[in-house]
Amino acid sequence: MSKETPSEDDSRHRIVAVTLDEDSIGRSGPDIEHERAIAIYDLVEKNLFAPEGAEGGPFTLHIAITGNRLMFDIRREDGAPVVTHLLSLTPFRRIVKDYFMICDSYYQAIRTATPDKIEAIDMGRRGIHDEGSRTLQERLNGKVHVDFETARRLFTLISVLHWKGNA
């Protein structure tokens, strides 16, 4: 008997709401706040999110930093707990640090640099973002099935949590 592969078109395998722990969010500028808002909107609009062993959703997701761990508190739409996963932040530290450095360069470049320089920086930014997304998919393997685009949006949220100097 083959295992059912979750589908993005299946409303049981999706996130319908995302919240970020306010205590985990560091102070950030308007560019980061804007990225956070867009990432949440895009994630809720289109995602594939299927916790292993859960009978289906849709789900809500609360993301927090707890000690040196990333916490995914997954619940059903009605608030019933499904599972909480704690992931070590260690595999993300260098990636997030690099991502913030290149984002700073990108935001400075879009104000003054040539289009070629902006494009080169943006390609680097996307490459680091992809690396973080793949790392997140690997860390969630066996816990939550997510497609690459969902992992990208989740990585953006993890990055913009900007865990108070711990990155």
Curated annotation (Swiss-Prot):
Record's InterPro entries?
A: UCP032146
HAMAP family with a match to the protein in the record: UPF0262
Describe the family membership recorded for this protein in Swiss-Prot or TrEMBL: Belongs to the UPF0262 family.
**Which protein, by its recorded name, is this?**
UPF0262 protein Nwi_0248
